[in-house]
């Protein structure tokens, strides 16, 4: 990609109200610019001062940044701390009885847990893990429903220095096995079932299936939380019930004091080569990013009630459910269910009931709720809201305006946040009391984040032209490496084209005349479906694993609810099916992908051809397939196409 023309033109702008600005922690654009200047002029002391102010250290650090082995950066590396201590223990003296979590189950039952109670539960479970032989540096895979126990598990791992790797509960047995195998996990923590939308979904059965596959032999124990009355198949000697494990365990557990650069967790994200990437985050740098961005981006105040709707299986649930809110001593809502069960007013009812003041959700959820009409939110008292946020993908301006007017009543700033699994915390977003917002733009980088848009040579592109989004200086919460694959880390994020100097985000973007950033999409073959990144190669590999399939190529096309829909172009081993036969095979392949990877990756559209469009060198012409998927006129040069006759076949929907 050199540069791209920007198609989206948005001129509407919304400044923070005088009342909001007056009460904001960072108030007015001058305050924002002052922080940016401070970071630009004294970069290391800027981050060092924040780390000293916000983190409780067992042993203070003496050096802020070691970049001698760039791009393997080390921050605060001689400091000693514990993430769980920073999220729990340090709040007990003044806020032991403050509510930490308001958990609402799928059926509406509400459980409130104080910081004191959460600390007790974490210590007991941490001691339980220690009784299973889990020690500092061991990897624990977490395959749990959204709930208090998921947070307890993650915090317990952090407390004893174990490295957690949370796997989204919708992933298949094969995906769970792949992550167990790559991490070398010794323990899996799961539940017998999860409950979503009134339906029980088996989790332990999926773990059992994963552990029966080759490559999962490292697992010694499976801890099972009994979420429902449903049973679970049992392997004596390996499986242990959660309630039995914590029985009689001490309610105190001394934290394992960790080096600042010791790994806190691994979170797997999709890669364009098919093999998931184990994104490894450090203890201190990651914690600082989550902690500080939470208070800045959401203008957090001690009496706020925060609700992030993300699952802990994704980075948003790590940074803005498990770590950011708790490190700030916040009260937050955690929700097990879905926004449309038992009816489409569920989100609004919960905001009213729990007096939520900061609401952070995905554009996918907003778009799905828009389809149900504007009357529904108006039936609820949403006056407690003061900040709205979006995450996971760019939000289209129309959805932004609906969110702003219908949900926020035209008084709540919207923080459209751009960041990634790899960045660990928010990078570009409006500070709500300082920056005027524009529908569809994530606006300006946070102070201390040196973001830019460049062409293939690394030169800055002019406003209105698209290019590569890069971050030019290291920052504390940046991914440290890809687990067990440092070469892939360098090649993916610090490529030779930029002399290894810039972090390449993998997104294209442009800047407008005010310097605001507008995200345009992915530059690689990773799809963004409902805010979740899915590798095309993983889906293609799953399709080709079906005995009927010879070859497959997967691309995305715009979808009004999910952001992107999965479109698969498939060549069968037998003849190209047509009519009802094609529909039958397509249905079978969709179910196959759902089983192999998870429902989230299920193709929305499958097209059959006798072949795929390839260059004479055998390379699949994916840009051509994207045009076909979108129903666009083919304008690409097809002179190098080996088999132009198959284009007509692939343009025919079922």
Curated annotation (Swiss-Prot):
Q: Which SUPFAM superfamilies match?
A: Acetyl-CoA synthetase-like
Explain the post-translational modification: Acetylated. Deacetylation by the SIR2-homolog deacetylase activates the enzyme.
List ligand-binding residues for ATP.
Answer: 392-394, 416-421, 507, 522, 533
Question: What enzyme class is recorded for this protein?
Answer: ligase
Q: Which InterPro entries match?
A: Ac_CoA_lig, ACAS_N, AMP-bd_C, AMP-bd_C_sf, AMP-binding_CS, AMP-dep_synth/lig_dom, ANL_N_sf
* KW Acetylation (keyword) present: yes
* Cofactor(s) required, per the database record: Mg(2+)
Gene Ontology terms: biological process: acetyl-CoA biosynthetic process from acetate
Q: Which GO terms describe its cellular component?
A: cytosol
Binding of CoA: at which residues? Answer: 196-199, 316, 530
GO MF term list: acetate-CoA ligase activity; AMP binding; ATP binding; metal ion binding
Q: List the disulfide bonds.
A: none
The UniProt entry, under CDD domains, shows: ACS
**Annotated residues for binding of Mg(2+):** 544, 549
Reactions catalysed:
acetate + ATP + CoA = acetyl-CoA + AMP + diphosphate
PANTHER family from the entry? ACETYL-COENZYME A SYNTHETASE (PTHR24095), ACETYL-COENZYME A SYNTHETASE 1 (PTHR24095:SF14)
Q: What does this protein do?
A: Catalyzes the conversion of acetate into acetyl-CoA (AcCoA), an essential intermediate at the junction of anabolic and catabolic pathways. AcsA undergoes a two-step reaction. In the first half reaction, AcsA combines acetate with ATP to form acetyl-adenylate (AcAMP) intermediate. In the second half reaction, it can then transfer the acetyl group from AcAMP to the sulfhydryl group of CoA, forming the product AcCoA.
> What protein does this entry describe?
Acetyl-coenzyme A synthetase
- What is the species listed in this Swiss-Prot or TrEMBL entry? Chromobacterium violaceum (strain ATCC 12472 / DSM 30191 / JCM 1249 / CCUG 213 / NBRC 12614 / NCIMB 9131 / NCTC 9757 / MK)
Quick one: which gene encodes this? Answer: acsA
């Amino acid at each position: 990609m050199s540069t791209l023309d920007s198609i989206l033109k948005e001129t509407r702008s919304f400044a923070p109200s005088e009342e909001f600005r007056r009460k904001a922690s960072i108030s007015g654009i001058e305050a924002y610019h002052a922080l940016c200047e401070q970071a630009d002029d004294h970069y290391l002391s800027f981050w060092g001062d924040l780390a000293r102010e916000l983190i409780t250290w067992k042993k203070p650090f003496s050096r802020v940044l070691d970049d001698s082995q760039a791009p393997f950066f080390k921050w605060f590396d001689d400091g000693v701390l514990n993430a769980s201590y920073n999220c729990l223990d340090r709040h007990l003296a003044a806020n032991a009885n403050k509510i930490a979590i308001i958990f609402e189950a799928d059926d509406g039952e509400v459980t409130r847990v104080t910081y004191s109670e959460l600390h007790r539960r974490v210590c007991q479970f941490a001691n339980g893990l220690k009784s299973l032989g889990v020690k500092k540096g061991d990897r624990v895979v977490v395959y749990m429903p959204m709930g208090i126990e998921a947070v307890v598990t993650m915090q317990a791992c952090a407390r004893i220095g174990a490295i957690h790797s949370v796997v989204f509960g919708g992933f298949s047995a094969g995906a769970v096995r792949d992550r167990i195998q790559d991490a070398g996990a010794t323990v899996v923590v799961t539940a017998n079932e999860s409950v979503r939308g009134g339906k029980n979904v088996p989790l332990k059965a999926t773990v059992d299936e994963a552990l029966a596959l080759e490559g999962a032999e490292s697992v010694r124990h499976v801890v099972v939380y009994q979420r429902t009355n449903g049973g679970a198949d049992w392997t004596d000697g390996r499986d242990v019930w959660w309630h039995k494990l914590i029985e009689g365990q001490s309610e105190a557990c001394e934290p394992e004091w960790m080096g600042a650069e010791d790994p806190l967790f691994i979170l797997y994200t999709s890669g364009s080569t098919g093999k998931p990437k184990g994104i490894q985050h450090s203890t201190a740098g990651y914690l600082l990013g989550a902690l500080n961005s939470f208070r800045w981006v959401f203008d957090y105040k001690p009496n706020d009630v925060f609700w992030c709707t993300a699952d802990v299986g994704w980075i948003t649930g790590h940074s803005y459910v498990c770590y950011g809110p708790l490190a700030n001593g916040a009260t937050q809502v955690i929700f097990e269910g879905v926004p449309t069960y038992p009816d489409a007013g569920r989100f609004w009812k919960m905001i009213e009931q729990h007096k939520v003041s900061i609401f952070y959700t995905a554009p996918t959820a907003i778009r799905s709720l828009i389809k149900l009409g504007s009357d529904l939110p108006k039936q609820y008292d949403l006056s407690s809201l003061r900040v709205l946020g979006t995450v996971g993908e760019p939000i289209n301006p129309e959805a932004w305006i609906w969110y702003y007017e219908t949900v926020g009543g035209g008084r709540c700033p919207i923080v459209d946040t751009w960041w990634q699994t790899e960045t660990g915390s928010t990078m570009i977003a409006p500070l709500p009391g300082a920056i005027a917002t524009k529908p569809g733009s994530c606006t300006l980088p946070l102070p201390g984040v040196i973001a830019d848009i460049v062409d293939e040579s690394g030169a800055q592109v002019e406003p209105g032209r698209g290019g590569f989004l890069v971050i030019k200086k290291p920052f504390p919460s940046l991914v440290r490496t890809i687990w067990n694959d440092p070469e892939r880390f360098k090649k993916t994020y610090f490529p030779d084209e930029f002399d290894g100097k810039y972090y390449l985000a993998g997104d294209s973007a442009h800047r407008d005349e005010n310097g605001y950033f507008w995200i345009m999409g992915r530059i690689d073959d990773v799809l963004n479906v409902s805010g979740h990144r899915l590798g095309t190669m993983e889906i293609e590999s799953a399709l080709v694993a079906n005995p009927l399939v010879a070859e497959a190529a997967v691309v995305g096309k715009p979808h009004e609810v999910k952001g992107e829909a999965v479109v698969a172009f498939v060549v069968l081993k037998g003849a190209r099916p047509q009519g009802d036969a094609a529909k039958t095979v397509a249905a079978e392949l969709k179910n196959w992908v759902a089983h192999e990877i998870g429902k989230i990756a299920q193709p929305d559209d499958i097209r059959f051809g006798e072949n795929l469009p390839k260059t004479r060198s055998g390379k699949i012409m994916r840009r051509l397939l994207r045009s076909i998927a979108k129903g666009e006129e083919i304008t690409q040069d097809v002179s190098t196409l080996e088999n132009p006759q198959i284009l007509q076949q692939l343009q025919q929907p079922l």
